[in-house]
Design a protein with these regions (language model features):
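Nucleotide/phosphate-binding catalytic cleft detector across ATP-hydrolyzing
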Residues: 1-34, 38-143, 157-271
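A cytosolic small-molecule/anion-sensing beta-strand core signal
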Residues: 154
Length: 271
């Protein structure tokens, strides 16, 4: 299965609440995000076996702010996937935005440990995304709910990472302000593809700001100018995002299918 087939397969398994008939041992990854929590199981080769996700507000700007809430959600996702697969999951990997340090960096591990998964590894989110996309040479931009992180890979080695607190939450805040609606309503409006064409003019400045943030992160690194650029994270679902982000960034960018699932799939591959 190539990288995109794996992503489509994971989406299908989550949507149908089913498991792929693949033999173990299995790897588990948990993505504790600003907007959602995703648990993914893969086989040894990184083929998706099962997964589950929930919208949640337990993380802010990449940091766990509701420890107990996060733990309860991971417990539920774990129980759901265990029921689907008919086995017990006992360990897993987590990820953090690049540059997260100290106790904040430890929090994700504590959350999954509290939910019954021994933490085996903690990776940078865009590094996990690069793994899922099977990229050994290129720039991965991960635009989540609260943060925009990048990872640059050269010959399979991670040579640069950076992170900024700008993400889909800011898109929703702008929509909430423009339409004078609560944030939660703006989130729902934003996730409706039928409304994307209409909201694009309102949110375009935020997308342009994100592209500028990434451009600034890479300023002075001319050697990366020819590297392919992949954008993942839920914000990249916005119709027209690929074109508008690319225009503002000044380079062609690629958005894989189901961009929200790329990082969680990659985290599991480290499990
Ligand atoms: P972070 O990595 O910053 O902690 P996260 O892991 O929660 O956040 P993702 O799950 O990649 O980030 O993306 C969540 C963001 O994507 C949210 O802002 C959410 O509103 C947005 N999003 C999700 N689905 C869609 C959609 N269909 N259209 C537009 N935006 C979407």
């Amino acid at each position: 299965m190539d990288a995109y087939e794996k992503i489509y397969q994971l989406y299908h398994l989550i949507k149908t609440k089913t498991a792929a008939d693949l033999p173990g041992p299995y790897k588990v990854g948990v993505d504790l995000g600003t907007a959602d929590v995703v648990l993914v199981v893969t086989d040894e080769s990184g083929n998706p076996v099962a997964g589950s996700m929930r919208w949640a507000s337990v993380v802010k700007d990449g940091l766990v702010v509701d420890f107990r809430g996060a733990m309860v959600i991971v417990e539920k996702l774990k129980a759901e996937v265990e029921a689907i697969m008919g086995i017990t999951l006992d360990k897993g990997a987590t990820a953090i935005p690049p540059g997260t340090v100290g106790r904040n960096a430890l929090a994700c591990g504590h959350v999954i440990a509290g939910a019954g998964l021994e933490p085996v590894c903690q990776v940078d989110e865009p590094v996990a995304a690069a793994k899922a996309l099977d990229i050994s040479h290129g720039i991965v931009v991960d635009i989540g709910g609260g943060t925009t992180g990048i990872a640059v890979l050269k010959n399979g080695e991670l040579v640069f990472t950076a992170d900024e607190p700008t993400g889909g939450t800011h898109v929703s805040l702008v929509l909430a302000g423009a339409y004078k609606i609560p944030f939660e309503e703006a989130e729902i409006l934003k996730r409706d593809p039928a409304r994307h064409r209409k909201i694009m003019p309102v949110i375009l400045p935020v997308i342009e700001k994100m592209a500028t943030v990434v451009k600034n992160m890479l300023a002075g690194y001319d050697e990366f100018n020819e590297y392919p650029v992949y954008v993942v994270g839920g914000t990249a679902y916005l119709q027209g995002f690929e074109t508008e982000f690319g225009k503002a960034f000044g380079r062609k960018v690629h958005v894989p299918p189901h961009p929200l699932l790329v990082t969680p799939l990659g985290i599991a591959m480290f499990g």
